């Protein structure tokens, strides 16, 4: 179904990451053997996507690829229909041969908020936990990261990533593995680890922070983004059921409380670098994501609250270091 041989070869040649080969191949074999109702339809469409490197690729200011000679209308429409097979597209946007994949999230806005605050990614190895379809990994490569590894257990996100990678000429600097972080050994191998939009889905947030720390080299940097509430270092919201229609959500600390949590598990130099209310311009339904989105999840009479009565989504970005 999927061939991870190139990634295994990369691990075999990397003395720091090589021990991952003790567990990873069997995990990915088990994943491939598990059935998923839509996977055959998606793979059939993926095989039809043309392979080959575009003449022009921009990963620095966007994720855009084009040829010097544009696709003819029929070819472009065929490609657009194939990409629509992978609906819903949640993270992006992408522009592919004049096809604008207008995703649910303006993930580029988040990237613009965090980029000025992080250690430059040039020549760094990066792990992106809960990477979605890999949009931010392409932006990391635009900042000249040496290697980007993303993990996310979603079949659809892997298909979307492989579709974009195929159009990119099968770029081997980025790899998406269909795993959760709990399946990773303590690699202590990455210069930078990103965890964005994951923490509130974890039953034990402190354990998640420890898992992230265990993926970093000594002195490595964590970039953590999550939903927060207003309040002091003791403020935490734990929704009884749903939050903005999301199930499986647990802890929403204040940014100040999250800073304390990071310090309590051994991170140093912890900084709150951004807090931002999520707007309906940043998250909304589109032709590429036709399901309900943030506008339907807010109280129609009070946009400062979710339909359950909780504070409306607000996200914070924190930067922290693993001690040397």
UniProtKB/Swiss-Prot annotation:
<protein>
    <recommendedName>
        <fullName>tRNA U34 carboxymethyltransferase</fullName>
        <ecNumber>2.5.1.-</ecNumber>
    </recommendedName>
</protein>
<dbReference type="InterPro" id="IPR029063">
    <property type="entry name" value="SAM-dependent_MTases_sf"/>
</dbReference>
<dbReference type="InterPro" id="IPR027555">
    <property type="entry name" value="Mo5U34_MeTrfas-like"/>
</dbReference>
<feature type="binding site">
    <location>
        <position position="200"/>
    </location>
    <ligand>
        <name>carboxy-S-adenosyl-L-methionine</name>
    </ligand>
</feature>
<feature type="binding site">
    <location>
        <position position="315"/>
    </location>
    <ligand>
        <name>carboxy-S-adenosyl-L-methionine</name>
    </ligand>
</feature>
<feature type="binding site">
    <location>
        <begin position="181"/>
        <end position="182"/>
    </location>
    <ligand>
        <name>carboxy-S-adenosyl-L-methionine</name>
    </ligand>
</feature>
<dbReference type="GO" id="GO:0016765">
    <property type="term" value="F:transferase activity, transferring alkyl or aryl (other than methyl) groups"/>
</dbReference>
<comment type="similarity">
    <text>Belongs to the class I-like SAM-binding methyltransferase superfamily. CmoB family.</text>
</comment>
<keyword id="KW-0819">tRNA processing</keyword>
<feature type="binding site">
    <location>
        <position position="105"/>
    </location>
    <ligand>
        <name>carboxy-S-adenosyl-L-methionine</name>
    </ligand>
</feature>
<dbReference type="Pfam" id="PF08003">
    <property type="entry name" value="Methyltransf_9"/>
</dbReference>
<feature type="binding site">
    <location>
        <position position="130"/>
    </location>
    <ligand>
        <name>carboxy-S-adenosyl-L-methionine</name>
    </ligand>
</feature>
<dbReference type="GO" id="GO:0002098">
    <property type="term" value="P:tRNA wobble uridine modification"/>
</dbReference>
<dbReference type="InterPro" id="IPR010017">
    <property type="entry name" value="CmoB"/>
</dbReference>
<feature type="binding site">
    <location>
        <position position="91"/>
    </location>
    <ligand>
        <name>carboxy-S-adenosyl-L-methionine</name>
    </ligand>
</feature>
<feature type="binding site">
    <location>
        <begin position="152"/>
        <end position="154"/>
    </location>
    <ligand>
        <name>carboxy-S-adenosyl-L-methionine</name>
    </ligand>
</feature>
<comment type="subunit">
    <text>Homotetramer.</text>
</comment>
<comment type="function">
    <text>Catalyzes carboxymethyl transfer from carboxy-S-adenosyl-L-methionine (Cx-SAM) to 5-hydroxyuridine (ho5U) to form 5-carboxymethoxyuridine (cmo5U) at position 34 in tRNAs.</text>
</comment>
<keyword id="KW-0808">Transferase</keyword>
<feature type="binding site">
    <location>
        <position position="196"/>
    </location>
    <ligand>
        <name>carboxy-S-adenosyl-L-methionine</name>
    </ligand>
</feature>
<feature type="binding site">
    <location>
        <position position="110"/>
    </location>
    <ligand>
        <name>carboxy-S-adenosyl-L-methionine</name>
    </ligand>
</feature>
């Amino acid at each position: 179904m999927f061939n991870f041989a190139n990634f295994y070869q990369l691990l075999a040649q990397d003395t720091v990451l090589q021990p991952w080969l003790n567990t990873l191949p069997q995990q990915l074999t088990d994943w491939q053997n598990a059935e998923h109702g839509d996977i055959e339809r998606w793979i059939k469409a993926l095989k039809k996507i043309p392979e080959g490197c575009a003449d022009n690729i921009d990963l620095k200011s966007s994720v855009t690829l084009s040829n010097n000679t544009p696709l003819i209308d029929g070819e472009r429409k065929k490609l657009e229909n194939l990409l629509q097979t992978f609906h819903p597209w949640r993270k992006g946007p992408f522009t592919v041969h004049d096809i604008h994949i207008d995703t649910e999230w303006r993930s580029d806005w988040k990237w613009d908020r965090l980029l000025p605050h992080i250690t430059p990614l040039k020549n760094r190895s990066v792990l992106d936990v809960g990477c979605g379809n890999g949009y931010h990994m392409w932006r990391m490569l635009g900042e000249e990261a040496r290697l980007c590894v993303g993990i996310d257990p979603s079949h659809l996100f892997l298909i979307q990533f492989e579709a974009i990678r195929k159009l990119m000429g099968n770029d081997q600097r980025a790899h998406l593995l269909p795993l959760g972080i709990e399946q990773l050994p303590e690699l202590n191998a990455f210069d930078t680890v990103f965890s964005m939009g994951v923490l509130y889905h974890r039953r034990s947030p402190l354990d998640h922070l420890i898992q992230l720390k265990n993926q970093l080299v000594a002195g490595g940097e964590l970039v953590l983004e999550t939903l927060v509430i207003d309040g002091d270092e003791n403020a935490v919201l734990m929704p009884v059921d749903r939050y903005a229609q999301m199930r499986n959500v647990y802890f929403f600390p204040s940014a100040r409380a999250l800073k304390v949590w990071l310090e309590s598990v051994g991170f140093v130099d912890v900084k709150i670098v951004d807090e931002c209310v999520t707007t309906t311009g940043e998250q909304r339904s589109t032709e590429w994501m036709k399901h309900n989105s943030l506008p339907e999840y807010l109280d129609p009479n009070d946009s400062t609250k979710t339909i359950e009565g909780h504070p409306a989504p607000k996200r914070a970005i924190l930067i922290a270091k693993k001690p040397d």
